[in-house]
Amino acid sequence: METVSSSAIGLVIAIVVVVASIWIYKAATGVMPGAKLVLAPPAGVQPSGVEENVAKFMFFYTTWCPHSRKAEGPWKSFQQVLKNTPRKYGGMTLQFEDVNAESQTGKASLYGISHYPTFKIQTKDSVYEFVGVPSVNNFRTALIGTFGQETF
């Protein structure tokens, strides 16, 4: 008969604790850990710089990051979709901004950017972070979930 080592039991207990913690967090907040929604702007960010009913959608990237280069395609495609067929999300008009974190280090620092690519959405009152695989559909889904119905 085989005996189970105490380290194997410890590993199983650790996994159970981590999984339980994730589900408790999700039940308490409504989102999975890692899905960020920043309800207050980071220190130093002045949300009043954005007009009422405008959402500034920012793409923070670096030229050396392969993930940034991969995200650029869906980002540009989404911009083109809105250029071809203008639409609003919950009454919010989108403005796009590309931020090269290498040359615009102050802006990247102001928004607390530590990894690339990062997508932030700033309104008059709040700053949100898009977390997910960059794609036209995922951008649309996130904007609908954050602001409301997509209207043409």
Stretches with model-predicted labels:
Residues 1-30, 75:
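Single-pass alpha-helical membrane anchors
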Residues 27-49, 54:
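Ser/Thr/Pro/Gly-rich low-complexity linker/stalk segments immediately outside membranes or between
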Residues 44-84:
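Local sequence-structure signature of Cys/Sec-based thiol-disulfide redox active-site neighborhoods
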Residues 56-59, 95-98, 118-120, 129:
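Beta-strand cores of modular interaction/reader domains in eukaryotic scaffold and signaling proteins
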Residues 60, 79, 84-106, 133:
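Thiol-based oxidoreductase modules, predominantly thioredoxin-like and allied folds used
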Residues 72-79, 105, 136, 140:
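Extracytoplasmic/secreted envelope proteins and their assembly/folding machinery
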Residues 109-114:
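A short glycine-leucine-enriched loop at secondary-structure breakpoints
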Residues 115-152:
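Non-catalytic, surface beta->alpha helical segment in thiol-disulfide oxidoreductase systems
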